[in-house]
Amino acid sequence: AGDFRRFDVYLPGTGTELAEWSMIRPELNKLDIEIQKLLKDAQEINENFSTDRLLEYLDNCVVIGCKLIKVHPFGDGNGRTIRGFINKLFEDVGLPPIYIKANERTEYHLAMNKANNEENYNYIKGFYRYKVCDSIIEWKEKTKRIKVKKYN
């Protein structure tokens, strides 16, 4: 667990070309530069909030997630691990975590395939923006129920 794969893999039915196992470290090194920029952006957003910058940050997190999927560094659990990483990046700027429900998986996979096969990130960005809003609404509803229980 936690070791990079030492074999080539593919995602059946997606058409997505994944990094050869020998290219995992070089590809991750390239992505590290973008991730370091994201971490600085998060700091700046927390120091000087701007909705436009927050949305740009969200979109950039999503693109990084797509690129990490194409590297596919582990033999198993890449999707869960990468979504967890994106959720951590969201948390760094106060955004809620997102969870993909079973009935949303097809839409998510179609958007991810469009991003990874055509470099068209619009659908996956839109999906994540919707999911962030969805998470905010769910959180507000949950806190209302907690308040009602607390005062009854």
Give the location of each predicted region.
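FIC/Doc superfamily catalytic core
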Residues: 1-76, 80-152
